Amino acid sequence: MSGNNLKMEILDLISSRQEGSYWDFKQEHHKNTANLLHDIICMANNPLCNQDGYIIYGVSDKTWQIIGIENDSSRRNQEHIISQLKSKSFAAGIRPIVRLITLHINEHEIDVLVIKNTMDTPYYLTSDFRDKQRVVRANHIYTRVSDVNTDIDKSADKHIVEALWKKHFGLNLNPFDRLKLLLADKSNWETSEDQHYNKICPEFTLCLEDDDDNGLYPEFY
């Protein structure tokens, strides 16, 4: 997404005067790293919204006024946020992908932390991380439903965790999009005479026919 398109989208979200399933307003940057980590994981583990998440700094979540973060003493840059993620013990070493973008709106700077939508859900830690009295707990699944994050001392409900694993394996996709996902990994396909079937999902089968009219023969890629 271009900077102008992102700016227009953020302005629309501010105009909505509410928070939602994929966006959250913060008047200033997180002072507590555990709170930052918790918010990122919640936004990355969104089972119902198929788009990037936004943590928008410099906008009041009470009045929706653009305050700006140009004088924010707690302001972090992208390198610092990514470094914090890299230093934490995530399951399988897979971490949320983030990007920090600064926008200029109404003579103020606001920072938008973009959390990429991926199929690597659920993201969770394998060891506790503490900053002062706040603890992001190991093996807890945090998520965001509507405009509410899972409490930092709790784990998501069972049906939400199931939805995150379905997203991980592409089980929430329509059949055509799921087929495209399966075709991306040729190693999971077996050949039997004139057809190919997926070893993991054998209900997906490709039947090939020779093109006798032009002398061409099929090749499975």
What function would you assign to each model-found segment?
Residues D24-K26, I101, V114, Y142-R144:
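Residues in well-ordered beta-strands of folded domains
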